[in-house]
Amino acid sequence: MDGLKRYLSSAPILATIWFAITAGILIEFNRFFPDLLFHPL
């Protein structure tokens, strides 16, 4: 049970770091290849 509490207390921090890294990768990708993220249907 102690491990579950530790996981639940660290999950928001890990999610914030993960989303920040993902957003940074998408922003840099969009800076170098601005037309590849939005495909016309």
Swiss-Prot record:
The chain crosses the membrane at residues 7-27. One of its GO terms (biological process) is photosynthesis. Belongs to the PsaJ family. InterPro entries: PSI_PsaJ, PSI_PsaJ_sf. It is a single-pass membrane protein. This is Photosystem I reaction center subunit IX. GO terms for cellular component: photosystem I; plasma membrane-derived thylakoid membrane. May help in the organization of the PsaE and PsaF subunits. Keywords: Membrane, Photosynthesis, Photosystem I, Thylakoid, Transmembrane, Transmembrane helix. The gene is psaJ. Pfam families: PSI_PsaJ (PF01701). It comes from the Bacteria. It is found in: Cellular thylakoid membrane. NCBIfam families: PRK02733.1.
